[in-house]
């Protein structure tokens, strides 16, 4: 473990780092590098031009310029979103809300599925499959699934458990996906069991199973070893890595804890937790683990949420364009 002064130095260095060209952080090797296509889609003048895009999308060595992909077609694809761990539990938290509004304005059928905020994978997989069957009955459009944090893992597990649904899916977009788990699941497992696991929440019950245990890196490694070869759906990774100014106050302690391992973290996951070798890397965005998927929830969270806006609708729709182009 690092001493207090050493940890403070790490935090200070991170505040000044990760803003310009340099090598990709360790552990981010992917099957396909689509950073150039994603930049072309996001940084277009009609979406997020110039300095605004540079503040949101990080640059690293090895990115190859690519033409802007054509806009995705609402006639071909339907969008399905799954929130992350605990998101359903807190009043005023609405994952993907602004993204869904934007997608529907563009003509897409887009839905956020209801899952238990403290459920294990198996329980939420069943809920996800039931909702997809109900919402898409009779709809011939292909599905693009979008999962935040643990929601990405639940979608992965659903694709394995329900190959009939997987046949209708063109892609899974993992947004700050906990694909490889997180060291925090090991470090804070006991604390979770004595606190958050027992607390009453308006939006969720105590849930089923042991969701934090399923986020331990060793458990995720075992999952990939068992199921990775059976997964045929392409997984696209959108990685979150915030500047110090974009950390939510409520996440600073978690960021500091993860900094014992690496400063390249979004306050809940290291960057290498968000990518697997078989995934397709879209890019690294300057956002913390919450802001990358959840709009600012208002005055109730004023003192615990980052005030720096993040253009989720533009980022997600650019990602959908790239994914749709790859699916043609």
Predicted regions and their residues:
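Bacterial N-terminal signal peptides
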Residues: 6-14
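Short aromatic-enriched loop/helix-cap "lid" or pocket-rim segments at secondary-structure transitions
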Residues: 93, 183-188, 246-251
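Active-site catalytic motif of lipid deacylating hydrolases and related acyltransferases
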Residues: 70-143, 197
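Bacterial N-terminal signal peptides that target proteins for export
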Residues: 1-5
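Serine-dependent carboxylesterase/thioesterase catalytic core
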Residues: 126-225
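C-terminal catalytic-base region of ester-bond hydrolases, centering on the histidine
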Residues: 230-328
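Flexible, membrane-associating and regulatory peripheral segments of lipid-active enzymes
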Residues: 16-91, 97, 101, 105-106, ...
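Glycine-rich His-Gly loop
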Residues: 82-85, 149, 177, 240
